[in-house]
Swiss-Prot record:
Keywords: Gluconeogenesis, Glycolysis, Isomerase. The active site is at residues 10, 88. Catalyzes the interconversion of 2-phosphoglycerate and 3-phosphoglycerate. Its EC number is 5.4.2.11. This is 2,3-bisphosphoglycerate-dependent phosphoglycerate mutase. Pathway: Carbohydrate degradation; glycolysis; pyruvate from D-glyceraldehyde 3-phosphate: step 3/5. It catalyses: (2R)-2-phosphoglycerate = (2R)-3-phosphoglycerate. Homodimer. One of its GO terms (molecular function) is phosphoglycerate mutase activity. The keyword Signal does not apply. It is an enzyme of class 5 (isomerase).
Length: 249
């Protein structure tokens, strides 16, 4: 039996538009981002996907993307689970900074390492910074020491995988079709795990906003195939645009 999993990065956010490092900052979608959510729903509808359950983060750009896509699918009634483990990678002291200005200051190669390397985190956010997640009530029930002040993709994967094993994988094994709407780096982490991508290869992976990525899995959740829905060239161009965000102007 083929299991179906869709990974969907949220639509364009205001800080995507402003080319700023976002991380765990809870920013809203732009009008384009809301349109991308609807378009994603339309692509999934055209594919004939009937979901049984959906998962998202606790950040509204992902939540609102999921809501827009489900409305277009006429599947608003789906049970939705929200978890901090699906949040974007925490960008530490880079959060809020302009990516191009940061590249001009520190060099494009350094910014690429911070953005796309596997195990090198950006400079950490101080625990006394008001923006640190330990001061956010949505994380109040969590162990303060579990909340990051910065993350690499490696530590993001360590955060995401328990949710995969405890929540998502059992549903897929039970034959359910699952939609996960999250963020560029939490989805890169899942992509790396599912496709057994090397630490070096993951550096070049960029996930575009608002384009559903459909995985077909076997009974043991090994990947049989995966593809972006819609026009492959459009997905390629969108991924290239993501890659260019870390370049100096």
């Amino acid at each position: 039996m083929t299991r179906k999993l869709v990974l969907l990065r949220h639509g364009q956010s205001q800080w995507n538009l402003d080319n700023r490092f976002t991380g765990w900052v809870d920013v809203e979608l732009t009008d384009q981002g809301r349109q991308e959510a609807v378009a994603a729903g339309r692509l999934m509808k055209d594919e004939g996907l009937q979901f049984d359950v959906a998962h998202t983060s606790v950040l509204k750009r992902a939540i609102h993307t999921l809501q827009g896509a489900l409305k277009e699918l006429d599947q608003d009634w789906l049970p939705v689970s929200k978890s901090w483990r699906l949040n974007e990678r925490h960008y530490g002291g880079l959060q809020g900074l302009d990516k191009a200005e940061t590249a001009a200051k520190h060099g494009e190669e350094q910014v690429k390492i911070w953005r796309r390397s596997y195990d090198i985190p950006p400079p950490a956010m101080d625990v006394n910074d008001p923006g640190h997640p330990c001061h956010d009530r949505r994380y109040a029930t969590l162990d303060r020491n579990a909340l990051p002040g910065t993350e690499s993709l490696a530590t993001t994967l360590v955060r995401v995988l328990p949710y995969w094993h405890d929540a998502i994988a059992p549903q897929l094994k039970a034959g359910q079709t699952v939609l996960v709407t999250a963020h560029g780096n939490s989805l890169r982490a899942l992509y790396k795990y599912l496709n057994d991508v090397s630490n070096e290869q993951i550096l070049e992976l960029n996930i575009p906003t608002g384009i559903p990525l459909l995985f077909e899995l076997d009974d043991s959740l090994q990947v049989r195939s995966f593809r972006y829905l819609g026009d492959p060239e459009a997905a390629k161009r969108a991924a290239e645009a993501v890659a260019n965000q870390g370049k100096a102007k």
